[in-house]
A protein has these predicted regions:
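Conserved pre-motif I regulatory segment
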Residues: 94-135
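Walker A/P-loop
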Residues: 132-152
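Conserved strand-helix element at the start of the C-terminal RecA-like helicase core
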Residues: 164-166, 170-172, 333-356
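Conserved helix-turn-beta segment of the N-terminal RecA-like "Helicase ATP-binding" lobe
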Residues: 172-193
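Conserved helix/coil segment N-terminal to the catalytic DExD/H
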Residues: 197-224, 242
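Post-DEXD/H (motif II) to motif III coupling segment of the RecA-like Helicase ATP-binding lobe
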Residues: 238-293
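Conserved interdomain hinge at the start of the Helicase C-terminal
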Residues: 312-341
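Single conserved hydrophobic/aromatic residue that forms the stacking wall/gate
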Residues: 360-367
Length: 367
């Protein structure tokens, strides 16, 4: 009987189980191991307690995050290994598509639940998410992310599912609650907010919370949720996000939203593993072309200085910061520009203070 090299099944909604020969385990371990760029600054690394590497495949248990299934399949293709999916009695197949979802159906639904007309790429994003049950959606600033989250929430509310929405700050909890109300929903009947000082126990179908408020809660608290949505997922601390998402072992539907995967606190593969394969909804330049964002013009003004030698880099910085002609040039440029002017400094204390005449500019100094 022909046997596949890898037999892949679901342990739960967090982990896949891979059954394979030991040598395949070690190849998988190599494939799914990466070094953290900032590891050398961490106490565990300095004390030689940890080698600075994150291992996403466990050779002892044969487990890997469900969201990395596409990458495991690609690994098999690259290494010419055969694989098969084995169905779990409780969790089904590792890869499932919701065939009941159609693009036209999503479009009609989004128009019916919202006072604002959804854009084509928003419909595409919601369709892709609902069809695949889990996704990491990359959605730039001003792309209308909250409308997409709202549409996903409304769909699962109608399916009588309990939904957990996790955001990084209390202001985002309030903002999302307000956005849902603005879209015309009776938000008070369905949603409950949790952050410092707010009650955690509730019968509400939808909970909007900061990750800081819930990551230490016991596993039992998370049992009732079948849907989890992480907004601004790149801002979550890796350990806390893993803690929350690992406790949601029965949450079949997982959606992460992030503006970028560059410079994330949590590695891209960890985010994909916890939520699902990434899907880029639209790029910022496309938003500009379509007129959804103001067009951006960048003019680079290069000020040339006469040659000078400095002992240290800091001496050079101080010379530039304190250069009167340069500071006057910036001041006059800002005064000549029409409309609102924003002046950004890397060092507000040193950079923004010297020209006293800056203070009468109607501009904001932002660190």
């Amino acid at each position: 009987i022909f046997m596949s090299n890898l037999i892949i099944s679901k342990k739960n909604e967090v982990y896949l189980h891979v059954n394979a020969e030991p040598h395949v385990y070690y190849e998988l371990a190599d494939q799914f191991t990466f070094e953290l760029p900032d590891a050398k600054f961490m106490p565990q690394y300095k004390s030689k307690y940890w080698d600075g590497k994150i291992r996403l495949f466990n050779t002892q248990t044969g487990q890997i995050y469900v969201g990395l299934l596409d990458r495991v399949v690609q690994f098999c293709k690259d290494h010419e290994y055969t694989y098969q999916f084995k169905e779990s009695e409780f969790y089904g197949l590792p890869f499932e598509v919701n065939d009941f979802i159609s693009k036209e159906g999503v479009k009609d639904y989004m128009f019916s639940i919202c006072k604002h007309s959804p854009r084509e790429y928003q419909i595409e994003g919601v369709y892709d998410a609902l069809r695949h049950n889990r996704k990491l959606l990359i959605s730039p600033t001003a792309s209308g992310k909250s409308l997409m989250i709202y549409s996903i929430v409304r769909y699962y509310v109608e399916k009588k599912q309990s939904i957990l929405i996790v955001v990084p700050t209390t202001s985002l909890v309030e903002q999302m609650y307000k956005d849902f109300a603005d879209y015309g929903w009776d938000v008070g009947s369905y949603c409950h907010k949790i952050y410092a000082g707010k009650e955690r126990e509730t019968d509400s179908q939808v909970i909007i919370t900061t990750w800081q408020s819930i990551y230490k809660l016991p596993r039992k608290y998370f049992e009732r949720f079948s849907v989890v949505i992480g907004d601004e997922a790149h801002q979550f601390k890796s350990k806390s996000l893993v803690s929350i998402m690992s406790k949601l072992s029965d949450a079949k539907y997982r959606f992460g939203f992030t503006g970028t995967l560059d410079g994330t606190q949590t590695h891209k593969w960890v985010l994909e593993g916890l939520f699902g394969a990434s899907y880029k909804i639209i790029k910022t330049d496309e938003l500009m072309k379509k007129g959804h964002l103001a067009k951006l013009n960048i003019n680079i003004l290069l000020l040339k200085h006469s040659p000078n030698k400095f002992e240290t880099f800091e001496d050079e910085i101080q010379y530039i910061i304190g250069h009167n002609r340069r500071n006057n040039f910036i001041k006059n440029l800002a005064l000549d520009l029409k409309g609102n002017t924003l002046i950004l400094y890397a060092r507000v204390e040193g950079h923004g203070q010297p020209p006293v005449s800056y203070t009468h500019l109607r501009a904001h100094e932002t660190p």
